[in-house]
Regions:
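Short alpha-helix of the ABC ATPase nucleotide-binding domain corresponding to the H-loop/switch region
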Residues: 134-139
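Electropositive, glycine-dotted interaction segments
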Residues: 1-72
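Conserved RecA-like P-loop NTPase ATPase core
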Residues: 57, 100, 127, 157, ...
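Short, surface-exposed secondary-structure junctions/capping segments
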Residues: 1-19, 111-116, 202-221
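Generic hydrophobic alpha-helical scaffold/packing signal
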Residues: 54, 101, 111-114, 130, ...
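Conserved ABC ATPase signature
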Residues: 72-115, 120-123, 129-133
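N-terminal accessory segments
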Residues: 56-67, 87, 207-210, 216-221
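C-terminal lobe/lid and adjacent interdomain/linker elements of RecA-like ASCE P-loop ATPase modules
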Residues: 73, 140-221
Length: 221
């Protein structure tokens, strides 16, 4: 219904649909998000946002002191966004986005979510949120979200089993998917449905196969 609404012009009787559609467009965000160049341009235009990003990247031990765009370099070499790194001895060096690690770029882009959720209630979704991130950085991102936002939500898939062992991960937050052998359909179920004792490790229960959602691997020989 909402996808159709975006393509047609309706009268004032459809105000409830218009309001719902506008809310989703503004506050619900898919997995791709803005490009690196889009974010960098926003930082140049918004000092508050730029200061937040630089502070967040420093807290994450990236030592980034500035972000800039070189339009001339972009035209000639494809290098557009540049990161200035500050070293202990006081010297600085600059790397283009092409030369940055995927982990640095991934964490940089994730900061847009936190910045927005600190100011308004948003919903973000990610597929394999841990992609290219050191586990400690993933935890830093998730705990920053948990401790500093009010009514925002993050929906994400992950292959990282270690998260099941974290104290801030409640059982009603965790959902598993298991593929049927018969028809290849996928069943979705919540960890809280198992009624496990509160002292039983969710991580260990999953590792030992009590919760399903594990591939049945054949012999390596």
């Amino acid at each position: 219904v909402l996808s159709t609404f975006a393509k047609v012009s309706l009268n004032e009787d459809a105000k409830i649909f218009r309001d719902t559609y506008n809310w989703i467009v503004r506050y619900v965000h898919g997995m791709k998000g803005n490009t690196l160049l889009d974010i960098a341009q926003q930082l140049i235009d918004n000092k508050e946002k730029k200061d937040y990003f630089i502070s967040a990247m420093r807290k994450a031990d990236f030592n980034i002191s500035n972000i800039s765009i070189d339009n001339e370099a972009r035209m000639h070499s494809g290098k557009d966004v540049f990161f200035t790194h500050h070293t202990i001895d006081g010297s600085d060096f600059t790397l283009s986005s092409i030369d940055q690690s995927l982990g640095t770029l991934r964490y940089f882009q994730l900061q847009e979510c936190i910045f927005n959720m600190l100011r308004e209630d948003h919903i973000y979704s990610f597929d394999e949120i841990e992609s290219n991130l050191h586990y400690d950085l993933l935890l830093h991102f998730l705990t920053t979200f948990m401790m500093n936002t009010a009514n925002s939500q993050i929906l994400f898939t992950t292959q990282d089993q270690q998260l099941l062992d974290e104290e801030f991960i409640r059982r009603d937050m965790v959902w598993f998917t298991e593929k049927s052998k018969e028809d290849a359909s996928t069943e979705l179920y919540c960890a809280s449905e198992f009624g496990l004792h509160k002292n039983l490790s969710l991580y260990k229960a999953y590792k030992t196969g009590k919760l399903g959602a594990k591939p049945e691997l054949g012999s390596i020989f």
